[in-house]
Amino acid sequence: MTHLLGVVGDPVAHSLSPFIHNGWLRAHQIDAVYSAFEVKAGELVSGLQSLSSQGVIGLNVTLPHKEEAMRLATSVSGTAHRLGAVNFLVRREDGWIGDNTDAPGFGLTLDFGDIEVSGRNVFLLGAGGSARAVASVLADRGARLTICNRTVGRAEDLARDLAPGARVRSLDEGLRKLSSAALVVNTLSLGHSGGRLELPPSAGGIFYDISYGKGAEAALKEAREKGWRALDGLGMLVAQAAISFEHWFGIKPDMAEAHARCRKLVEATS
């Protein structure tokens, strides 16, 4: 019997997840298909019921459903509780089991790129859902973390919840101090709305944007021109997919191969 898996969100047609997972499924000769399912905001209850009746056994969850997925799951992991969101579901007889791959995916990305953060100055730009996962990993790994956000109160809430030792700055103040950073992680969505970051020069620091493709182009270009080592979020996407794949099938897929496949596709379509 062919297993059915997928990603739910809105919009979701642009997702690279089917491309990643179906490549791994073919490589391991697994009888399964991974698809993208568009489910509108507020329709996750009926969406999950429909997908369950179709025989879907596992899902990745993207915007705008991560918080609602946590409320709907029969049980959720400690990581998901800590981050306040679910982005991974497995169907069991008694309902959907929820987890969150954002934090372990970011951690795996740091490992994959040999990026050491312990005791180093790290600046996190943004305080939204993705920033919560990033902050938790950076704090757990002993980074000297500064969280920068336009709304300082949100950054303070994030620090209190997940990174008690972090410093908090307004975005403008933080941007002026970035030169001292060994790593900057940008979770802001400026590139998707035509906005632009004004980065200071760097002598070899790393600028990591969790976006990829056109959404990250402007920030990465600015970073390279200012002397930063610029990295996009494609690696984090692949890492999260690998964690999901291993959960479902007990197999560690080839991340490097998938990353190369995705890079080629993104460059061809940018």
UniProtKB/Swiss-Prot annotation:
UniProt-annotated binding residues for shikimate: 15-17, 62, 87, 102, 212
Reactions that this protein is recorded to catalyse: shikimate + NADP(+) = 3-dehydroshikimate + NADPH + H(+)
GO biological process: amino acid biosynthetic process; aromatic amino acid family biosynthetic process; chorismate biosynthetic process; shikimate metabolic process
Functional pathway: Metabolic intermediate biosynthesis; chorismate biosynthesis; chorismate from D-erythrose 4-phosphate and phosphoenolpyruvate: step 4/7
GO cellular component: cytosol
Active site positions, chain numbering: 66
Classification via Gene3D superfamilies: Leucine Dehydrogenase, chain A, domain 1 (3.40.50.10860), NAD(P)-binding Rossmann-like Domain (3.40.50.720)
Protein keywords: Amino-acid biosynthesis, Aromatic amino acid biosynthesis, NADP, Oxidoreductase
Gene Ontology molecular function terms on file: NADP binding; shikimate 3-dehydrogenase (NADP+) activity
Annotated NADP(+) binding sites: 126-130, 149-154, 210, 233
Top-level taxonomic group: Bacteria
Annotated transmembrane regions: none
Zinc keyword on record: no
Pfam family, one: SDH_C
Entry EC no(s): 1.1.1.25
Entry-linked InterPro entries: Aminoacid_DH-like_N_sf, NAD(P)-bd_dom_sf, SDH_C, Shikimate_DH, Shikimate_DH-bd_N, Shikimate_DH_fam, Shikm_DH/Glu-tRNA_Rdtase
UniProt subunit comment: Homodimer.
Family listed: Belongs to the shikimate dehydrogenase family.
HAMAP family assigned: Shikimate_DH_AroE
Physiological role: Involved in the biosynthesis of the chorismate, which leads to the biosynthesis of aromatic amino acids. Catalyzes the reversible NADPH linked reduction of 3-dehydroshikimate (DHSA) to yield shikimate (SA).
Protein's UniProt name: Shikimate dehydrogenase (NADP(+))
Lineage of producing organism: Bacteria, Pseudomonadati, Pseudomonadota, Alphaproteobacteria, Hyphomonadales
